[in-house]
Protein backbone atom coordinates (compact mmCIF):
# COMPACT_ATOMS: atom_id res chain seq x y z
CA UNK A 1 0.00 0.00 0.00
CA UNK A 2 1.39 3.43 -1.00
CA UNK A 3 1.89 6.26 1.46
CA UNK A 4 -1.12 8.21 0.19
CA UNK A 5 -3.30 5.09 0.25
CA UNK A 6 -2.53 4.75 3.96
CA UNK A 7 -3.65 8.36 4.43
CA UNK A 8 -6.90 7.72 2.53
CA UNK A 9 -7.62 4.57 4.54
CA UNK A 10 -6.98 6.40 7.82
CA UNK A 11 -9.25 9.28 6.79
CA UNK A 12 -11.98 6.87 5.67
CA UNK A 13 -11.83 5.00 8.99
CA UNK A 14 -11.88 8.29 10.91
CA UNK A 15 -14.89 9.54 8.95
CA UNK A 16 -16.82 6.36 9.76
CA UNK A 17 -16.55 7.28 13.46
CA UNK A 18 -16.71 11.09 13.25
CA UNK A 19 -19.17 12.27 10.60
CA UNK A 20 -18.70 16.05 10.69
CA UNK A 21 -14.97 16.38 11.32
CA UNK A 22 -14.41 13.36 9.08
CA UNK A 23 -16.23 15.12 6.23
CA UNK A 24 -14.04 18.21 6.71
CA UNK A 25 -10.90 16.08 6.79
CA UNK A 26 -12.00 14.32 3.59
CA UNK A 27 -12.32 17.69 1.83
CA UNK A 28 -8.75 18.49 2.88
CA UNK A 29 -7.55 15.65 0.66
CA UNK A 30 -8.12 18.03 -2.26
CA UNK A 31 -5.19 20.20 -1.19
CA UNK A 32 -2.91 19.06 -4.04
CA UNK A 33 -5.66 19.75 -6.56
CA UNK A 34 -6.15 23.28 -5.21
CA UNK A 35 -2.40 23.90 -5.31
CA UNK A 36 -2.37 22.95 -9.00
CA UNK A 37 -5.27 25.25 -9.80
CA UNK A 38 -3.74 28.15 -7.90
CA UNK A 39 -0.37 27.73 -9.65
CA UNK A 40 -1.96 27.42 -13.09
CA UNK A 41 -4.19 30.47 -12.73
CA UNK A 42 -1.41 32.50 -11.10
CA UNK A 43 0.99 31.53 -13.90
CA UNK A 44 -1.58 32.61 -16.48
CA UNK A 45 -1.98 35.97 -14.74
CA UNK A 46 1.78 36.54 -14.59
CA UNK A 47 2.19 35.46 -18.20
CA UNK A 48 -0.47 37.86 -19.47
CA UNK A 49 0.41 40.86 -17.29
CA UNK A 50 4.21 40.60 -17.15
CA UNK A 51 5.45 38.59 -20.13
CA UNK A 52 2.90 39.76 -22.70
CA UNK A 53 1.78 43.01 -21.12
CA UNK A 54 5.18 44.40 -20.17
CA UNK A 55 8.16 42.70 -21.81
CA UNK A 56 6.82 41.77 -25.28
CA UNK A 57 7.01 44.86 -27.51
CA UNK A 58 5.44 43.59 -30.74
CA UNK A 59 1.64 43.57 -30.95
CA UNK A 60 1.64 40.68 -33.42
CA UNK A 61 4.01 38.69 -31.24
CA UNK A 62 1.91 39.39 -28.14
CA UNK A 63 -1.25 38.32 -29.98
CA UNK A 64 0.31 35.02 -31.06
CA UNK A 65 1.58 34.37 -27.53
CA UNK A 66 -1.85 35.13 -26.08
CA UNK A 67 -3.77 32.94 -28.55
CA UNK A 68 -1.49 29.91 -28.16
CA UNK A 69 -1.22 30.28 -24.37
CA UNK A 70 -4.98 30.73 -23.96
CA UNK A 71 -5.73 27.73 -26.18
CA UNK A 72 -3.42 25.45 -24.18
CA UNK A 73 -4.83 26.78 -20.89
CA UNK A 74 -8.45 26.23 -21.96
CA UNK A 75 -7.69 22.70 -23.19
CA UNK A 76 -5.88 21.93 -19.93
CA UNK A 77 -8.80 23.15 -17.80
CA UNK A 78 -11.34 21.39 -20.02
CA UNK A 79 -9.44 18.10 -19.73
CA UNK A 80 -9.15 18.51 -15.95
CA UNK A 81 -12.87 19.24 -15.62
CA UNK A 82 -13.73 16.14 -17.65
CA UNK A 83 -11.36 14.08 -15.50
CA UNK A 84 -12.91 15.32 -12.26
CA UNK A 85 -16.59 15.33 -13.21
CA UNK A 86 -16.76 12.08 -15.18
CA UNK A 87 -18.23 9.44 -12.91
CA UNK A 88 -15.62 6.87 -11.88
CA UNK A 89 -16.27 3.52 -13.54
CA UNK A 90 -17.57 1.08 -10.93
CA UNK A 91 -18.27 -2.62 -11.45
CA UNK A 92 -21.85 -3.16 -12.72
CA UNK A 93 -24.39 -4.87 -10.48
CA UNK A 94 -24.70 -7.81 -12.85
CA UNK A 95 -21.32 -9.02 -11.56
CA UNK A 96 -22.78 -9.47 -8.07
CA UNK A 97 -23.70 -13.12 -7.28
CA UNK A 98 -26.48 -14.35 -5.03
CA UNK A 99 -26.16 -14.15 -1.25
CA UNK A 100 -26.13 -17.94 -1.04
CA UNK A 101 -23.12 -18.25 -3.39
CA UNK A 102 -21.31 -15.46 -1.58
CA UNK A 103 -21.81 -17.15 1.80
CA UNK A 104 -20.61 -20.49 0.42
CA UNK A 105 -17.43 -18.88 -0.93
CA UNK A 106 -16.66 -17.10 2.33
CA UNK A 107 -17.26 -20.31 4.29
CA UNK A 108 -14.36 -22.03 2.50
CA UNK A 109 -11.99 -19.03 2.56
CA UNK A 110 -9.63 -18.56 5.54
CA UNK A 111 -10.02 -15.36 7.54
CA UNK A 112 -7.25 -13.53 9.38
CA UNK A 113 -7.64 -10.25 11.30
CA UNK A 114 -11.15 -9.73 9.86
CA UNK A 115 -9.83 -10.15 6.30
CA UNK A 116 -10.27 -13.04 3.91
CA UNK A 117 -6.82 -14.38 3.03
CA UNK A 118 -6.96 -16.51 -0.12
CA UNK A 119 -3.22 -17.25 0.07
CA UNK A 120 -3.77 -19.25 3.26
CA UNK A 121 -6.23 -21.62 1.55
CA UNK A 122 -5.48 -25.33 1.32
CA UNK A 123 -5.55 -27.08 -2.10
CA UNK A 124 -8.95 -28.52 -1.21
CA UNK A 125 -10.30 -25.07 -0.30
CA UNK A 126 -8.91 -23.57 -3.53
CA UNK A 127 -10.68 -26.24 -5.56
CA UNK A 128 -13.94 -25.55 -3.72
CA UNK A 129 -13.54 -21.80 -4.17
CA UNK A 130 -12.91 -22.12 -7.88
CA UNK A 131 -15.97 -24.32 -8.31
CA UNK A 132 -18.12 -21.77 -6.51
CA UNK A 133 -16.62 -18.91 -8.54
CA UNK A 134 -17.47 -20.75 -11.76
CA UNK A 135 -21.03 -21.10 -10.46
CA UNK A 136 -21.05 -17.35 -9.75
CA UNK A 137 -20.06 -16.59 -13.35
CA UNK A 138 -22.82 -18.87 -14.59
CA UNK A 139 -25.33 -17.21 -12.25
CA UNK A 140 -24.28 -13.71 -13.33
CA UNK A 141 -24.00 -14.78 -17.00
CA UNK A 142 -20.53 -13.29 -17.38
CA UNK A 143 -17.20 -14.65 -18.61
CA UNK A 144 -13.84 -13.41 -17.36
CA UNK A 145 -10.41 -14.25 -18.73
CA UNK A 146 -8.22 -13.19 -15.80
CA UNK A 147 -7.37 -15.23 -12.74
CA UNK A 148 -5.65 -14.35 -9.48
CA UNK A 149 -2.21 -15.40 -8.23
CA UNK A 150 -3.50 -18.80 -7.07
CA UNK A 151 -5.29 -19.57 -10.33
CA UNK A 152 -8.86 -18.76 -9.23
CA UNK A 153 -11.33 -16.48 -10.93
CA UNK A 154 -11.03 -13.01 -9.41
CA UNK A 155 -13.46 -12.04 -6.67
CA UNK A 156 -13.56 -9.05 -4.32
CA UNK A 157 -14.54 -10.04 -0.80
CA UNK A 158 -14.93 -6.40 0.27
CA UNK A 159 -17.26 -5.32 -2.54
CA UNK A 160 -18.93 -8.74 -2.90
CA UNK A 161 -18.75 -9.25 -6.67
CA UNK A 162 -16.77 -10.97 -9.41
CA UNK A 163 -14.01 -8.76 -10.77
CA UNK A 164 -14.23 -8.07 -14.50
CA UNK A 165 -11.00 -8.29 -16.46
CA UNK A 166 -8.55 -5.49 -15.53
CA UNK A 167 -10.73 -4.34 -12.63
CA UNK A 168 -8.99 -3.70 -9.32
CA UNK A 169 -9.99 -2.80 -5.78
CA UNK A 170 -8.82 0.72 -4.90
CA UNK A 171 -7.53 0.71 -1.33
CA UNK A 172 -7.75 4.53 -1.24
CA UNK A 173 -11.46 4.66 -2.15
CA UNK A 174 -12.41 1.27 -0.74
CA UNK A 175 -14.25 0.29 -3.96
CA UNK A 176 -13.55 -1.65 -7.15
CA UNK A 177 -13.07 0.17 -10.46
CA UNK A 178 -13.19 -1.12 -14.03
CA UNK A 179 -9.86 -1.06 -15.90
CA UNK A 180 -8.26 0.54 -12.88
CA UNK A 181 -5.05 2.47 -13.54
CA UNK A 182 -4.26 4.17 -10.22
CA UNK A 183 -5.61 6.49 -7.56
CA UNK A 184 -4.08 9.90 -8.24
CA UNK A 185 -3.47 12.09 -5.15
CA UNK A 186 -2.95 15.12 -7.44
CA UNK A 187 -6.63 15.07 -8.42
CA UNK A 188 -7.90 13.08 -5.42
CA UNK A 189 -9.74 10.42 -7.40
CA UNK A 190 -9.33 7.15 -9.27
CA UNK A 191 -8.12 7.08 -12.86
CA UNK A 192 -10.05 4.32 -14.63
CA UNK A 193 -11.35 3.34 -18.05
CA UNK A 194 -13.87 6.19 -18.15
CA UNK A 195 -11.55 9.12 -17.38
CA UNK A 196 -8.10 7.83 -18.37
CA UNK A 197 -8.15 9.64 -21.73
CA UNK A 198 -9.09 12.93 -20.05
CA UNK A 199 -6.39 12.47 -17.42
CA UNK A 200 -3.75 11.91 -20.10
CA UNK A 201 -4.91 14.95 -22.07
CA UNK A 202 -4.74 17.03 -18.90
CA UNK A 203 -1.10 16.20 -18.24
CA UNK A 204 -0.27 16.58 -21.95
CA UNK A 205 -1.87 20.00 -22.37
CA UNK A 206 -0.58 21.22 -19.01
CA UNK A 207 2.93 20.11 -19.95
CA UNK A 208 2.77 21.93 -23.28
CA UNK A 209 1.35 24.97 -21.49
CA UNK A 210 4.26 25.01 -19.05
CA UNK A 211 6.80 24.52 -21.83
CA UNK A 212 5.17 27.33 -23.84
CA UNK A 213 5.31 29.66 -20.84
CA UNK A 214 8.98 28.83 -20.28
CA UNK A 215 10.01 29.19 -23.92
CA UNK A 216 8.22 32.47 -24.59
CA UNK A 217 9.14 33.96 -21.21
CA UNK A 218 12.87 33.80 -21.91
CA UNK A 219 12.56 37.12 -23.73
CA UNK A 220 11.40 38.81 -20.55
CA UNK A 221 14.43 37.59 -18.61
CA UNK A 222 16.74 38.86 -21.34
CA UNK A 223 15.01 42.26 -21.50
CA UNK A 224 15.31 42.71 -17.73
CA UNK A 225 19.10 42.57 -17.99
CA UNK A 226 19.12 44.67 -21.17
CA UNK A 227 16.94 47.41 -19.66
CA UNK A 228 19.07 47.49 -16.49
CA UNK A 229 16.16 48.96 -14.53
CA UNK A 230 17.25 46.94 -11.55
CA UNK A 231 15.06 48.60 -8.91
CA UNK A 232 11.99 49.55 -10.95
CA UNK A 233 11.57 46.10 -12.50
CA UNK A 234 12.80 44.04 -9.54
CA UNK A 235 9.33 43.15 -8.23
CA UNK A 236 8.13 41.98 -11.64
CA UNK A 237 11.34 40.06 -12.22
CA UNK A 238 11.18 38.23 -8.87
CA UNK A 239 7.60 37.07 -9.51
CA UNK A 240 8.69 36.25 -13.02
CA UNK A 241 11.66 34.24 -11.76
CA UNK A 242 9.53 32.35 -9.27
CA UNK A 243 7.05 31.38 -12.01
CA UNK A 244 9.94 30.30 -14.20
CA UNK A 245 11.40 28.04 -11.49
CA UNK A 246 8.03 26.50 -10.55
CA UNK A 247 7.19 25.92 -14.21
CA UNK A 248 10.56 24.31 -14.85
CA UNK A 249 10.21 21.98 -11.85
CA UNK A 250 6.64 20.88 -12.67
CA UNK A 251 7.46 20.64 -16.36
CA UNK A 252 10.01 17.98 -15.56
CA UNK A 253 8.32 16.27 -12.62
CA UNK A 254 5.63 15.14 -12.39
CA UNK A 255 4.30 16.26 -15.79
CA UNK A 256 7.18 15.36 -18.08
CA UNK A 257 7.89 12.01 -16.47
CA UNK A 258 4.19 11.12 -16.38
CA UNK A 259 3.88 11.65 -20.13
CA UNK A 260 6.85 9.37 -20.82
CA UNK A 261 5.64 6.77 -18.31
CA UNK A 262 2.09 6.59 -19.66
CA UNK A 263 3.29 6.57 -23.27
CA UNK A 264 5.26 3.43 -22.44
CA UNK A 265 2.25 1.90 -20.68
CA UNK A 266 -0.14 2.55 -23.57
CA UNK A 267 2.39 1.22 -26.08
CA UNK A 268 2.20 -2.13 -24.23
CA UNK A 269 -1.51 -1.77 -23.37
CA UNK A 270 -0.80 -1.91 -19.65
CA UNK A 271 -2.15 0.04 -16.72
CA UNK A 272 -0.06 1.40 -13.87
CA UNK A 273 -1.02 -1.48 -11.57
CA UNK A 274 -0.45 -4.04 -14.33
CA UNK A 275 3.04 -2.66 -14.85
CA UNK A 276 3.91 -3.67 -11.29
CA UNK A 277 1.61 -6.71 -11.11
CA UNK A 278 0.89 -8.13 -14.59
CA UNK A 279 -2.52 -9.57 -15.35
CA UNK A 280 -2.73 -13.37 -15.34
CA UNK A 281 -4.89 -14.85 -18.10
CA UNK A 282 -6.38 -18.32 -18.01
CA UNK A 283 -5.37 -20.98 -20.53
CA UNK A 284 -2.19 -19.10 -21.53
CA UNK A 285 0.10 -17.61 -18.87
CA UNK A 286 2.07 -15.69 -21.52
CA UNK A 287 -1.01 -13.97 -22.98
CA UNK A 288 -1.51 -10.22 -22.58
CA UNK A 289 -3.54 -7.30 -23.93
CA UNK A 290 -0.85 -5.93 -26.26
CA UNK A 291 -2.53 -5.71 -29.68
CA UNK A 292 0.07 -3.49 -31.36
CA UNK A 293 0.90 0.17 -30.70
CA UNK A 294 -1.80 1.75 -32.90
CA UNK A 295 -4.57 -0.52 -31.60
CA UNK A 296 -3.36 0.05 -28.05
CA UNK A 297 -3.58 3.83 -28.44
CA UNK A 298 -6.96 3.51 -30.11
CA UNK A 299 -8.22 1.47 -27.15
CA UNK A 300 -7.47 4.47 -24.91
CA UNK A 301 -8.21 7.47 -27.14
CA UNK A 302 -11.01 5.94 -29.21
CA UNK A 303 -11.99 6.09 -32.86
CA UNK A 304 -11.03 9.72 -33.44
CA UNK A 305 -10.54 13.17 -31.90
CA UNK A 306 -7.64 11.85 -29.85
CA UNK A 307 -6.61 15.34 -28.70
CA UNK A 308 -10.11 16.46 -27.75
CA UNK A 309 -11.45 15.66 -24.24
CA UNK A 310 -14.71 14.09 -25.38
CA UNK A 311 -15.87 10.49 -25.14
CA UNK A 312 -14.75 8.56 -28.22
CA UNK A 313 -14.15 5.19 -26.57
CA UNK A 314 -14.70 1.98 -28.51
CA UNK A 315 -14.61 -0.24 -25.40
CA UNK A 316 -16.88 -0.74 -22.40
CA UNK A 317 -14.11 -1.23 -19.83
CA UNK A 318 -15.25 -4.79 -19.12
CA UNK A 319 -14.16 -6.80 -22.16
CA UNK A 320 -10.80 -6.63 -23.93
CA UNK A 321 -9.04 -8.21 -26.88
CA UNK A 322 -6.37 -10.69 -25.83
CA UNK A 323 -3.12 -11.56 -27.59
CA UNK A 324 -2.49 -15.25 -27.07
CA UNK A 325 0.99 -16.67 -27.50
CA UNK A 326 -0.53 -20.13 -27.83
CA UNK A 327 -2.44 -19.77 -31.12
CA UNK A 328 -4.73 -22.66 -30.22
CA UNK A 329 -6.23 -20.43 -27.53
CA UNK A 330 -6.60 -17.36 -29.75
CA UNK A 331 -10.39 -17.57 -29.91
CA UNK A 332 -10.90 -18.84 -26.40
CA UNK A 333 -12.88 -15.75 -25.37
CA UNK A 334 -15.29 -14.19 -27.82
CA UNK A 335 -17.45 -11.32 -26.73
CA UNK A 336 -21.15 -11.29 -27.62
CA UNK A 337 -22.16 -7.70 -28.34
CA UNK A 338 -25.41 -6.94 -26.54
CA UNK A 339 -26.83 -3.89 -24.84
CA UNK A 340 -27.04 -4.27 -21.02
CA UNK A 341 -30.65 -3.04 -21.19
CA UNK A 342 -31.72 -5.65 -23.74
CA UNK A 343 -33.88 -8.60 -22.83
CA UNK A 344 -30.87 -10.87 -22.81
CA UNK A 345 -28.05 -10.07 -20.40
CA UNK A 346 -24.80 -8.70 -21.80
CA UNK A 347 -22.31 -11.52 -21.60
CA UNK A 348 -19.45 -13.33 -23.26
CA UNK A 349 -19.19 -16.94 -24.34
CA UNK A 350 -16.37 -19.46 -24.48
CA UNK A 351 -15.86 -21.27 -27.74
Swiss-Prot record:
Alphabetical UniProt keywords: Acyltransferase, Differentiation, Lipoprotein, Membrane, Palmitate, Spermatogenesis, Transferase, Transmembrane, Transmembrane helix
Entry's Gene Ontology cellular component terms: endoplasmic reticulum; Golgi apparatus; membrane
Transmembrane segments: 21-43, 60-80, 198-218, 241-261
Matches recorded under Pfam families: DHHC
Any GO MF annotation of the entry: protein-cysteine S-palmitoyltransferase activity
Gene Ontology BP terms: amoeboid sperm motility; membrane fusion; nuclear migration; positive regulation of cell size; protein targeting to membrane; pseudopodium organization; spermatid development
Keyword Endoplasmic reticulum: no
Residues of the DHHC domain: 154-204
Membrane topology listed for this record: Multi-pass membrane protein
Localization terms from the record: Membrane
Entry-linked InterPro entries: Palmitoyltrfase_DHHC, PFA4/ZDH16/20/ERF2-like
Tissue-wise expression: Expressed during spermatogenesis in budding and budded spermatids.
EC number of this enzyme: 2.3.1.225
Catalyses which reaction(s): L-cysteinyl-[protein] + hexadecanoyl-CoA = S-hexadecanoyl-L-cysteinyl-[protein] + CoA
Phenotype when changing residue 302 to E: In eb118; defect in spermatogenesis. Temperature sensitive fertility defect
Phenotype of the disrupted gene, per the record: Self-sterile phenotype which is slightly temperature sensitive. In hermaphrodites the temperature sensitivity is restricted to the larval stage 4 when spermatogenesis takes place. Premature disassembly of FB-MO before or while spermatids are budding from spermatocytes. FB remain in spermatocytes whereas MO localize to spermatids but often fail to fuse with plasma membrane. Resulting spermatids are usually smaller than normal and contain several or mislocalized nuclei. Fewer spermatozoa are generated and those that are have abnormally short pseudopods and are immotile.
Protein family membership: Belongs to the DHHC palmitoyltransferase family.
Entry note about domains: The DHHC domain is required for palmitoyltransferase activity.
Described purpose of this protein according to its UniProt entry: Involved in spermatogenesis, specifically in the morphogenesis of fibrous body-membranous organelles (FB-MO), which are Golgi-derived organelles used for transporting sperm-specific components, in spermatocytes and in their localization into budding spermatids. Required for the proper formation of spermatids and spermatozoa.
Protein name: Palmitoyltransferase spe-10
Organism of provenance: Caenorhabditis elegans
